[in-house]
Curated annotation (Swiss-Prot):
Biological role: Associates with the EF-Tu.GDP complex and induces the exchange of GDP to GTP. It remains bound to the aminoacyl-tRNA.EF-Tu.GTP complex up to the GTP hydrolysis stage on the ribosome.
Protein's name in the database: Elongation factor Ts
GO molecular function, one term: translation elongation factor activity
Taxonomy of the source species: Bacteria, Pseudomonadati, Pseudomonadota, Alphaproteobacteria, Hyphomicrobiales
Gene Ontology cellular-component terms listed: cytoplasm
HAMAP family per record: EF_Ts
Assigned keywords, A-Z: Cytoplasm, Elongation factor, Protein biosynthesis
UniProt subcellular location: Cytoplasm
Stretches the record annotates as Involved in Mg(2+) ion dislocation from EF-Tu: 80-83
Gene designation: tsf
SUPFAM superfamilies: Elongation factor Ts (EF-Ts), dimerisation domain (SSF54713), UBA-like (SSF46934)
């Protein structure tokens, strides 16, 4: 049996919203594997993990910059939210986004080596900011969408100032028709993505491992049923999964679209555009997703400081 610690139980509880004893049992049953424990709880019908499993915490800012038919998102992490509210840090993050869009760069190492407006290279500007502010900072990722003809939709949720916030969204709609007719829809879809958090444009874009994991959960949840019945249940469950996770299959959250999917709304817009409209790409950056936030023992820190060890 794995050594299940209180910290592990706490982490699983935060991910799933499940009671402490159920979390402890799940960890014991899965050898202390957090992700396996999430699935174990889902299979037992004890978890809200489908909605909460992706919740993580990290500090910093997402920056959004749009220039014509190009848009960029960047994420820069800091150790504390206090630094994220620092004007010098905000200035740096905004300039990183500007460099990315002007030079068409998304590779982190290439960005660090790019020319910085104030002189030198961007990597040096980050190092200087670390020295000045006194806290470590990391340029984590960047994404760029360019549509030669069409529209860029963007949205920043939990904005701390213009173009900076906690959740940033970019979406690109390509059309040879009237781009102005498409622009309002691009904005609507960006807001939809922020709220609905799709994983891919359609089923073909989903990670095969994610699909297989969902199949396994559905199969085990319905274990014992005849094979032909189980096959239909899994097939039906996957269709529901695609409606939840694939952008074109999701129902628009705008009342005026009357229950239509995003794919159907795009088709409707083609009449006004006078040409086909294609959703070519989207990005949704939530600050800190996929990062494990280090937790410190405050009492131990105080004791260490008092004894001169800190």
């Amino acid at each position: 049996m794995a050594n299940v610690t209180a910290a592990m139980v706490k982490e699983l509880r935060e991910k799933t919203g499940t009671g402490m004893m159920d979390c402890k049992n799940a960890l014991n049953e899965t050898g202390g594997d957090i992700e396996a424990a999430v699935d174990w709880l889902r299979k037992k019908g004890l978890s809200k993990a489908a909605k909460k499993a992706g919740r993580v915490a990290a500090e910093g800012l997402i920056a959004l910059d749009v220039e014509g038919t190009s848009g960029v998102l960047v994420e820069v992490n800091s150790e504390t939210d206090f630094v994220a509210r620092n004007e010098d840090f905000q200035f740096l993050v905004r300039n990183i986004a500007r460099v990315a869009i002007q030079q068409g760069l998304t590779d982190v190492e290439a960005l660090k080596g790019a020319h910085y407006p104030a002189g030198g290279v961007l990597g040096d500007a980050i190092s200087e900011a670390v020295a000045k502010i006194g806290e470590n900072m990391t340029l984590r990722r960047a994404a760029l969408i360019h549509v030669p003809t069409g529209a860029i939709g963007s949205y920043m949720h939990n904005s701390v100032t213009e173009g900076l916030g906690k959740i940033g969204v970019l979406v690109g709609l390509a059309t040879e028709g009237n781009a102005e007719a498409v622009q309002p829809l691009a904005r609507e879809i960006a807001l939809h993505i922020a709220a609905a958090a799709p994983l891919a444009i359609d089923a073909s874009g989903l990670d095969p491992a994610v699909v297989e994991r969902e199949k396994a959960v559905l199969a085990e949840k319905n274990a014992g049923k005849p094979a032909n019945v189980l096959e239909k249940i899994v097939e039906s469950g996957l269709k529901s999964f695609y409606k939840e996770t694939c952008l074109l299959d999701q129902v628009s959250n705008y009342p005026e679209h009357a229950g239509k999917t995003i794919g159907q709304v795009l088709k409707d817009t083609e009449k006004a555009a006078g040409a086909p409209v294609t959703l070519v790409a989207f990005y949704r950056y939530a600050l800190g997703e996929g990062i494990e936030k280090q937790e410190s023992d405050f009492a131990a820190e105080v004791a260490a400081a008092a004894s001169g060890q800190a």
